[in-house]
């Protein structure tokens, strides 16, 4: 569990570091399917061997099959997960312009059940919030994020999602306030449940919000605090390197990229080097949903 959480945190931090200047990044909910490790291989194989019409027909048959199972066993999680995956696959076949709220709604239904049946797995609730946000139900999305944060105030996925939602509503101060409150309570929360709030991760997220608002001095200060808190953690080093690079301070940025690569586990070194070579991303409007690397297993 710790390794899975850490990998997700690293991926998010790298994404935030690269995209800090456009706010919190967005991948529509169909991207959650497209990045599901357990389904990538099967999907590639299916797409390579079946024409689109045949593939759609096969997926529709799967949906009907899972629905029949759920009529008999409404809380059968294997069927719920299968139904969710099949519907996401059908959704992924559509162009973005073709996706209608009704297409997202059929994904929301199994997600609501899975979130209720697995309150300890915030991934389902985050996906649910993301889906609701995409159909314009911002209040429903906010409620889903708040429900997670009420029991897991340090959940980075929920924090990232809530921050993205607030920024999409032109409420950066509310996003900053949420993160600052999380940090102010981190010591107490971690005393009760050690490790439940990743303080450095929250600081990096806070810095990215400041950076998205072009408050570079504040962002740099937060990153420095994170680096001071844990000098061996490469995440704030990467984030500050991207901040410097965005401001045209390439020489200083290179030093930090090199430091981050030296600190990072082997599996992340190439990603950091690639981030160091990528051209700075210009400012643009913040989109309304969080990135998500994979659906829950």
Regions inferred by a protein language model and the residue ranges of each:
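N-terminal leader/linker segments that initiate helical-solenoid repeat arrays
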Residues: 1-102
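Canonical tetratricopeptide repeat
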Residues: 82, 127, 161, 205, ...
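Terminal, low-structured helical/coil segments at or just beyond the last alpha-helical repeat
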Residues: 2-23, 32-39, 190-193, 197-200, ...
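Canonical positions in the second alpha-helix
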Residues: 69, 113-114, 147-148, 181-182, ...
């Amino acid at each position: 569990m710790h390794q899975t959480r850490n990998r997700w945190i690293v991926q998010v931090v790298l994404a935030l570091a690269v995209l800090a200047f456009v706010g919190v990044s967005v991948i529509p909910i169909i991207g959650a399917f497209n990045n599901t490790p357990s389904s990538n291989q099967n999907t590639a194989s299916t797409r390579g061997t079946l024409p689109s019409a045949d593939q759609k027909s096969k997926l529709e048959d799967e949906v009907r099959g899972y629905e029949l199972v759920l009529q008999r066993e409404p809380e059968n999680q294997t069927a719920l997960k299968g139904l969710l995956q099949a519907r996401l696959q059908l959704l992924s076949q559509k162009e973005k312009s073709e996706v209608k709220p009704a297409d997202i709604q059929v994904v929301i239904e199994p997600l609501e059940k899975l979130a209720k049946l697995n309150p300890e797995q915030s991934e389902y609730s985050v996906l649910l919030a993301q889906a609701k946000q995409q159909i314009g139900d911002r209040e429903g999305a906010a409620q889903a994020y708040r429900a997670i944060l009420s029991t897991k105030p340090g959940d980075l996925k929920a924090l990232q999602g809530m921050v993205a939602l607030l920024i999409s509503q032109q409420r950066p101060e509310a996003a900053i306030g949420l993160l600052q409150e999380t940090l102010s309570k981190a010591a107490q929360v971690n005393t009760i449940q050690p490790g439940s709030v990743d303080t450095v991760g929250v600081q990096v997220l806070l810095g990215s919000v400041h950076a998205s608002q072009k408050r570079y001095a504040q962002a740099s200060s937060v990153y420095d605090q994170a680096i001071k808190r844990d000098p061996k953690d490469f995440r704030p080093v990467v984030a500050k390197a991207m901040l410097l690079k965005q401001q045209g301070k390439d020489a200083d940025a290179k030093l930090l990229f090199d430091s981050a690569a030296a600190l990072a586990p082997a599996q992340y070194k190439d990603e950091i080097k690639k981030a160091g070579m990528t051209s700075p991303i210009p400012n643009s409007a913040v989109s309304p949903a969080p990135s998500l690397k994979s659906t829950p297993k």
